[in-house]
Amino acid sequence: MRSLLVLCLLLPCWLSARELIIGGILEPPLKWLDHSGQPRGLDVDLVTTIFGGLKVPIRIELLDSGARLTRNAEGGVYDLLLSHSYKPERESYLLYPTQAHIRHSWHFFVRKDDLGKIRYRTLADLKPWRIGVTKDFSYTQELTAAMADPAYRFQVIPINQLQLRKLIAGRIDVVPMSLVTAFAQIREEGLEGKLDVTVHRDGVDS
């Protein structure tokens, strides 16, 4: 995924005049809130180090909803975003850098008991199954096109962290997630041994 650090680094004198507000979506271990509500994580450390070196004050706000993050960005609430996935229509109000600071490996997750039952060679193999997707996430052209096809059974929710819980509860059958995000949640919520991944596919833009 990509962030908007490049623009700010080009304008250090202007930026030093006020506090920068940086928005992001909760995505442990990259960005999360500790028990006191303070932002933590690899992305947080990155921007804190960069702007600390520039003597630029920052405030980081982490949300659980990608749709809310996008609305706030479009409305001018934030000066920068942390790791907001690319969509062409967002270029009307966001400046994306040409280089991504991190790349994710995405897989389709299933319940461990269903691993031998759910076959996945092409996306069409998933038509019989309920697929969880997250509102306002940027998916590949193939997956985005499938979401408009009534032959598929997509379920859209606003909060990505609910996807694995829905999967465990049997409310969906398959969900595309990044390995970093999914494994962090699996470890945090004690879901080891309950979920597995299908063969790797480029399911989502990162």
Predicted regions and their residues:
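Short glycine-rich His-centered loop
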Residues: 18-42
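Alpha-to-beta junction loops
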Residues: 56-57, 74-83, 129, 168-177
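Periplasmic-binding protein-like
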Residues: 24-26, 103-107, 191-206
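Positively charged n-region of N-terminal signal peptides that target proteins for export
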Residues: 1-4
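Short helix-initiation/N-cap motifs at beta->coil->alpha
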Residues: 59-71, 154-169
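Ligand-binding cleft/hinge of the Venus flytrap
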Residues: 47-56, 99, 123-127, 135-158, ...
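Acidic, polar ligand-binding/catalytic clefts
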Residues: 48, 61-125, 139, 200-202
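N-terminal signal peptide c-region/cleavage motif recognized by signal peptidases
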Residues: 12-17
